[in-house]
Every structure is written in structure tokens, then in C-alpha cells.
């Protein structure tokens, strides 16, 4: 399971890349979604590589992001352990995070919005014009790199 975060805006973005981002449920800058590691999604991620940061997050970071930024599909309730136990198939947020990482379920299947609306990164980006290899934020991150980004945007 990969976490995708849109870092660059839609100005001068080709329409097929905009369409791909919408298919991935990312509609604005600083929005995040979780996608499985299948060939279809791998191709979509490769297409939007220059506009997003992505990588496989750790369970602890995913728990933090879900606790602070997850929203129900309907209503405006806070998502906490009680809400998860009452409305999903899991007992708490850590169980849900483990199931998401092992690709047993999706956010939408559990009644949560597939888009996580994140805060801009505290301390700023390392650079949204360059890939990770050049010292920027764009492209594929290792687990530690995507964890740092998601933690800054929690």
C-alpha cells in the first residue's frame, strides 16, 4: 500500500495528468490517498510522479494520520477508536491501519473518505521542483522519507 500526496498544483498541468489524479482521488494540493500496489495503480503513479510524493508508510505514521485527518464519508464525526469500533469491521485505529497496509480493505469500504486532507508541512517542503534524488520532495520515498513528510503534514 502506497500513500500518495499531491505537492504541486494544477497550473500548467496536462489534462491527462489531472484526470489521473482525480482517478486516484486526489483533487487538491496537500491531499493524500492510499492506493494498493497493483499494475494498474503502478502505471497511474508513474504518470503523476512529477506532481506527487509517494511511498509505503509505517503503521505508526498511518495511525497518526488516520487519527488526525480521517473523515467519515457521511457526516462530520471525529474518527477515533470509538468511531472505528462502532462503524467499521475493526476494533481500533491500529487494527484499521494494519488492515490498510496489508491491503485487506480500503478507506471507502470502511465508510471513510478515500482522501485525507493534510496540513501543509510544518517547517516547509524540501523543494517541490526537484525529485528526492536531487534533494527535493517529488517522487518515490523510502518508508522513513514518507513518514517524515506525513508526520510534518499530520
Swiss-Prot record:
<keyword id="KW-0687">Ribonucleoprotein</keyword>
<comment type="function">
    <text>This is one of 5 proteins that mediate the attachment of the 5S rRNA onto the large ribosomal subunit, stabilizing the orientation of adjacent RNA domains.</text>
</comment>
<feature type="region of interest" description="Disordered">
    <location>
        <begin position="114"/>
        <end position="146"/>
    </location>
</feature>
<protein>
    <recommendedName>
        <fullName>Large ribosomal subunit protein uL30</fullName>
    </recommendedName>
</protein>
<dbReference type="InterPro" id="IPR016082">
    <property type="entry name" value="Ribosomal_uL30_ferredoxin-like"/>
</dbReference>
<feature type="compositionally biased region" description="Basic and acidic residues">
    <location>
        <begin position="123"/>
        <end position="144"/>
    </location>
</feature>
<keyword id="KW-0699">rRNA-binding</keyword>
<dbReference type="InterPro" id="IPR039699">
    <property type="entry name" value="Ribosomal_uL30"/>
</dbReference>
<comment type="subunit">
    <text>Part of the 50S ribosomal subunit. Binds 5S rRNA.</text>
</comment>
<dbReference type="GO" id="GO:0019843">
    <property type="term" value="F:rRNA binding"/>
</dbReference>
<keyword id="KW-0689">Ribosomal protein</keyword>
<dbReference type="InterPro" id="IPR035808">
    <property type="entry name" value="Ribosomal_uL30_euk_arc"/>
</dbReference>
<dbReference type="InterPro" id="IPR036919">
    <property type="entry name" value="Ribo_uL30_ferredoxin-like_sf"/>
</dbReference>
<comment type="similarity">
    <text>Belongs to the universal ribosomal protein uL30 family.</text>
</comment>
<dbReference type="GO" id="GO:0003735">
    <property type="term" value="F:structural constituent of ribosome"/>
</dbReference>
<dbReference type="GO" id="GO:0022625">
    <property type="term" value="C:cytosolic large ribosomal subunit"/>
</dbReference>
<dbReference type="InterPro" id="IPR018038">
    <property type="entry name" value="Ribosomal_uL30_CS"/>
</dbReference>
<dbReference type="GO" id="GO:0006412">
    <property type="term" value="P:translation"/>
</dbReference>
<dbReference type="GO" id="GO:0000463">
    <property type="term" value="P:maturation of LSU-rRNA from tricistronic rRNA transcript (SSU-rRNA, 5.8S rRNA, LSU-rRNA)"/>
</dbReference>
<dbReference type="InterPro" id="IPR005997">
    <property type="entry name" value="Ribosomal_uL30_arc"/>
</dbReference>
<dbReference type="Pfam" id="PF00327">
    <property type="entry name" value="Ribosomal_L30"/>
</dbReference>
<keyword id="KW-0694">RNA-binding</keyword>
Amino acid at each position: 500500500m502506497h500513500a500518495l500526496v499531491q505537492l504541486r498544483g494544477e497550473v500548467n498541468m496536462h489534462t491527462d495528468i489531472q484526470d489521473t489524479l482525480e482517478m486516484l482521488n486526489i483533487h487538491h494540493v496537500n491531499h493524500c490517498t492510499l492506493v494498493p500496489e497493483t499494475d494498474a495503480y503502478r502505471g497511474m503513479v508513474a504518470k503523476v510522479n512529477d506532481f506527487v510524493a509517494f511511498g509505503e508508510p509505517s503503521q505508526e505514521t498511518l495511525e497518526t494520520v488516520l487519527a488526525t485527518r480521517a473523515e467519515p464519508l457521511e457526516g462530520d464525526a471525529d474518527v477515533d477508536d470509538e468511531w472505528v469500533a462502532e462503524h467499521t469491521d475493526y476494533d481500533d485505529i491500529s487494527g484499521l491501519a494494519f488492515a490498510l497496509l496489508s491491503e485487506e480493505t480500503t478507506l471507502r469500504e470502511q465508510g471513510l473518505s478515500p482522501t485525507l486532507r493534510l496540513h501543509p508541512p510544518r517547517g516547509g517542503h524540501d523543494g517541490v521542483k526537484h525529485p528526492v534524488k536531487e534533494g527535493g520532495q517529488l517522487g518515490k520515498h523510502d518508508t522513513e522519507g514518507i513518514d517524515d513528510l506525513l508526520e510534518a503534514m499530520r
